[in-house]
Amino acid sequence: MELNGAKILYTIHTDIPVLGDFKITQTLVSTWIVMALLSGLAIWLGSNLKLENVSKRQAAAEFIVERLDQFVHDNMGYHFDKYIPLIGSIFALSIGCNLISVIGLWSPTADLNTEAAWAIVVFVLIMYYKIKTNGIFSYLKGLLDPIFIMAPINVLSEVSTPVSMAFRHFGNILSGTVISTLLYWALASLSHVIFGWLPGFLSQIQLFQIGIPAFTGLYFDWFGGCIQAFIFCTLTAIFIKRAAGED
């Protein structure tokens, strides 16, 4: 049994200072595949739209858009409609990256780099709205409240927002992957103990590995993945709204 991170599939050697070599990992390849699948799905759902006699495909597309609009309006208000594509993209990409493991590919969300990249985007937006709302000097002055010696703690509090978002999502997804792997290994050992005494190929029967891992995968990959995507997007909406000074 092995529990390893994403493998490096190919390395492109460069002479760029600081950045170093460009490594193509399982995370990167799986993310590209998910993005390609989501792009194809979006193009398919958004093609040949009609005002009357809409197809089931168009009805499904409209339902998704309406639910996304309602989600953003409920959590952020009507002043943040421009962030509907961002919230929707993060949600779709998160679910896609979680579910890609169902077909045997590496799940990008089991790599902290994926969640960290999303969290950095959210952090930049939070900082933008805080500075836009209060001004750069007022924002910097706020880091000194209530007394100047609290500045390091206030800075740490600002940085902890993207860190906590990234680790929350990553930890839940990775824990599901680890538990599924441990369960699969345990079931294989149990099968060997029970059927190992049989002669020939019968001793190699992995009966307990059939069916049971599918149920655990259904929870961790489908249900758990959707829940974590929902939580991440909800926190994104709330933090951006709060940074903009909206009640």
Predicted regions and their residues:
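Selective transmembrane helix interface/packing segments
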Residues: 1-247
